[in-house]
């Protein structure tokens, strides 16, 4: 079960660590009653990277079709760190990491340190 207080607490721990430049969390981005990661994360974001969720859903649609609309994958900026929130399935994590996060992470971190 996804607990919003635990999610926000773990994110706050990452933000408090000066060595942390990016936070990646997974799971809880669906639409069931227990899925509350999106709400917890969205309330913390100072800037949203809407393109992440949009492109993630597009790529997911290419792989699995219409169930892609149920994903609430998101990304944004919190206190100068980039945060990615992905669905919990192995395939979704692999897709996000290989196609979006790893190819762009260095550029995002560089932009945030300007």
Where are these regions (language model features)?
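Non-catalytic beta/alpha edge segments that cap or flank active sites
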Residues: 1-114
């Amino acid at each position: 079960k996804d607990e919003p207080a635990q999610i926000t607490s773990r994110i706050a721990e990452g933000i408090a660590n000066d060595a942390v430049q990016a936070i990646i969390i997974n799971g809880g981005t669906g639409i069931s009653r227990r899925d509350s990661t999106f709400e917890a994360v969205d309330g913390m974001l100072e800037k949203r990277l809407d393109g992440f969720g949009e492109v993630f859903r597009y790529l997911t649609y290419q792989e699995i079709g219409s169930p892609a609309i149920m994903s609430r994958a998101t990304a944004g900026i919190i206190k100068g760190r980039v945060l990615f929130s992905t669905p919990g399935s192995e395939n979704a994590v692999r897709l996000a990491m290989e196609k979006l996060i790893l190819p762009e992470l260095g550029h995002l971190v560089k932009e945030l340190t300007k």
